[in-house]
Amino acid sequence: ALGSSLASSRNLSGDFTDILVVLGKYAQAAGVSILIGIDELQYAEKEELEALACALHRVTQLGLPVMFCCAGLPKLLKMLGEAKTYSERQFNFVKVDSLPRDKAVEAIVRPAQKLDVHYSDEAVDAIIDYTEGYPYFIQELCSTIWISSDSRCVSLETVLECTSLTDIRLDEGFFSVRCDRCTPRQKEFLIAMVRCGELPCTLANVAHYMRRDVSSIGPLRAQLISRGLIYSAARGEVDFTVPQFDRYLRRTEQID
């Protein structure tokens, strides 16, 4: 009802700003704060990002207790800058990367300890080696271990047995949903990145393994960035947006 009574101008930025200002004033009067979470923000249209930036700018000016916590792929920083030039000053951009070793150990060990289950040191080392500290992979492997074992002490052998099962789970879900809709040419680009050996890799090397000119693969690069599969790591360089995507392609495409 609130939205329908306010959002009448058919201007997304203006309507969204009006709604947030009213919500912010209600929250301020009630002595509470509003936190709005948005995931996968890289899929937003430019008009939607403009509306977000405009609305946040206005509630900040008015000192209203409204905040956003957004998550997205690396290209999001550029997208927000293109939507509104002042966006880079509005948002605090935090890179979410692999956990440092001490935090990875804590993520593995502490939840299990609460249920009187313990990991051997060798098991913890193997989990960190496999996951490279990436939080989602830790979650998936430890979930597989939890389902597969009823022992109160998780051994190295148990971890090694579960890594192949976790590979299957990741391949059929996490990785495949990102790759299945690629065209043959786009997949060729991704495979060429893997053949480069080191990541990030240069576009020149990708073009070499595709046996094409650098200029001719530019559209494929742009398409894959738009799909959220790769990002521009530096000038003339690209990398995968998710860890171990190269391992997935090696497994599924039989890349030497």
Language-model regions, residue ranges each:
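Short regulatory helix/loop adjacent to the ATP-binding pocket of P-loop NTPases
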Residues: 75-91
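Amphipathic alpha-helical "lid/sensor" segments that cap RecA-like P-loop NTPase cores
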Residues: 104-173
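Conserved Walker B catalytic segment
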Residues: 5-74, 82
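C-terminal leucine-rich, beta-strand-based interaction scaffolds used for sensing/assembly
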Residues: 122, 168-256
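Short glycine-enriched loops at secondary-structure junctions
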Residues: 72-77, 100
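Conserved AAA+ ATPase "SRH/arginine-finger" region at the nucleotide-binding site
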Residues: 92-103
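Conserved strand-to-helix beginnings and helix N-cap segments that scaffold or border functional pockets
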Residues: 46-53, 105, 139, 186, ...
